[in-house]
Swiss-Prot record:
Keywords of this entry: DNA-directed RNA polymerase, Nucleotidyltransferase, Transcription, Transferase
Gene3D superfamilies reported for this sequence: 3.90.940.10
EC number(s) on file: 2.7.7.6
Pfam families reported in the protein's UniProt record: RNA_pol_Rpb6
Origin superkingdom: Bacteria
Protein name: DNA-directed RNA polymerase subunit omega
GO cellular component, as recorded: DNA-directed RNA polymerase complex
UniProt record, GO biological process: DNA-templated transcription
Organism placement in taxonomy: Bacteria, Bacillati, Bacillota, Bacilli, Lactobacillales
Amino acid sequence: MIVYPSIDKLLENVNSRYSLAVLASKRAHQIEAGDLKMLSEYKSPKTVGMAMEEIAAGNVTIDPDSLMLEKDAEKMDKLSQKDGE
């Protein structure tokens, strides 16, 4: 259960719960891999909690360009699968 930051605070910075889950997961993996932390202090000892605190602070956002590239890659993959049939 998420107590801090609140889901309402998190959704101010991310447009859906699904996007929030994906963003928090990706950022948590980055923190675990040794990426620099974006806040000087965290309330949560866990990386997912740290990621959510960074999202609530507005330090982590979804890059719209990467979303477009991802969608384009999915379309190209589907087209290449059709061509191979």
